[in-house]
């Protein structure tokens, strides 16, 4: 088939119009990718969004349009954007169009070596539903909003309350213990965090660059010539990045690029059997934000709060692909930025509908110095039922919620009249609730350099035992401070006895 060739007719920021003149020229299809070779030899990829009139298509650019001018030649590829697949993608870093950004050379994407980033969600009869719990070793999550294997998990929070630290801790706890494959999609977040994550994955052995490279890294070097390419196939993770400095086209598509690789791992290809995959996205809000940045330029009328009118459709098309089939499962953890701490904003509100478990991070709790700053009363989980978790776990979670809810209701009275006006029973409830609140905190492995405390993983049995002891009043004699940033209840008791001895 002869290539379709057009010319750039209009450029408005990231949106480029391309005109295809000539008789019987077949316009590129919606979501096809087009390529422009710039004067410096670099390739600019565009994605068709709409057809205007008889011979013009409107496209979004996947990279900066700086230096582009009208009249540039545009070549149609006849395919959507593709990501490389196969055993060689393990341990690699890609951008939105599937080019390697780790300096280790590009992988082929043509024919069977590539997979389109736009795909249909699995059919209804292919879906699998299981209700197995995924324990994370983080007390507040495992007790109050337990995650399910093959489920969708959202971490909601405003700016600076700890979403990325929590997602990094989950990668540390689940990806290392899980032993399966992980895909990390960095969508419109800080490049520094991506770099930190890669170094952390190398140190923990999830990504394997070989011993020679690790020696050079320990000495402060980054010598890519020492990377053991065949050994890299033993890696357990793949990264796809479209960070803050990228144009909106890349940020609006990079989540789909990462998802395509996760789907390939899940479904397998040919002899490859499907696998259980972890899919981390930081941050899913930037996917929506990028869509809203280009929506008006694409000629769409804005809807509520200036978001694109297709917000729910775009989110639904992506979220329905993140699912578990009878071939394999995708367990996804998505960080969701909450603009101005308003959970009713259309972007986080649309995301809520798709999730099995939500972990809401609260600024009020962060201000108390309780980390992770999870709000136990706002967070939810589909599998918090006695049938799945057992009566002991369920009852303990309800008792914790009950005592915290009572404390919340009494806070207005305390603020106006003071603690003295409470009944003895209420005073006791408040003092226990404050201990519970502090015991929900925990030192993280990834935050050791901030806290100076060694990170801990807490078994669910120890978590249940600890909270039951506090609520039953067995530890009323210990000071509140003893419960802050402790793992197990034994650590808290030891710290409390020490404080009492020193007092």
UniProtKB/Swiss-Prot annotation:
EC number: 7.1.2.2
Pfam families xref list: ATP-synt_ab, ATP-synt_ab_N, ATP-synt_VA_C
Catalytic activity: ATP + H2O + 4 H(+)(in) = ADP + phosphate + 5 H(+)(out)
Chief place where the protein resides: membrane
Keyword presence, Cytoplasm: no
One cellular component term from this protein's GO annotations in UniProt: proton-transporting ATP synthase complex
HAMAP family (alphabetical): ATP_synth_beta_bact
Subunit text: F-type ATPases have 2 components, CF(1) - the catalytic core - and CF(0) - the membrane proton channel. CF(1) has five subunits: alpha(3), beta(3), gamma(1), delta(1), epsilon(1). CF(0) has three main subunits: a(1), b(2) and c(9-12). The alpha and beta chains form an alternating ring which encloses part of the gamma chain. CF(1) is attached to CF(0) by a central stalk formed by the gamma and epsilon chains, while a peripheral stalk is formed by the delta and b chains.
Name of this protein: ATP synthase subunit beta
Natural source organism: Flavobacterium psychrophilum (strain ATCC 49511 / DSM 21280 / CIP 103535 / JIP02/86)
High-level lineage: Bacteria, Pseudomonadati, Bacteroidota, Flavobacteriia, Flavobacteriales
Gene that this polypeptide is encoded by: atpD
